[in-house]
Amino acid sequence: MKVKPSVKKICDKCKVIRRHGRVMIICENLRHKQRQG
C-alpha cells in the first residue's frame, strides 16, 4: 500500500474507490494499491 498526496491509475485494471472518505486505488497488481492521505 502506497500512501500518496495524489493517487492516479497506473494501468487499465486500476479502479478508484472511496472508503470511509479516503480515495483508494485497487488493482489486480498489488503493487498498484494506493491510498490518499
UniProtKB/Swiss-Prot annotation:
Keywords: Ribonucleoprotein, Ribosomal protein. It comes from the Bacteria. GO terms for cellular component: cytoplasm; ribonucleoprotein complex; ribosome. One of its GO terms (biological process) is translation. One of its GO terms (molecular function) is structural constituent of ribosome. NCBIfam families: rpmJ_bact (TIGR01022). Belongs to the bacterial ribosomal protein bL36 family. PANTHER family: 50S RIBOSOMAL PROTEIN L36, CHLOROPLASTIC, LARGE RIBOSOMAL SUBUNIT PROTEIN BL36C. This is Large ribosomal subunit protein bL36B.
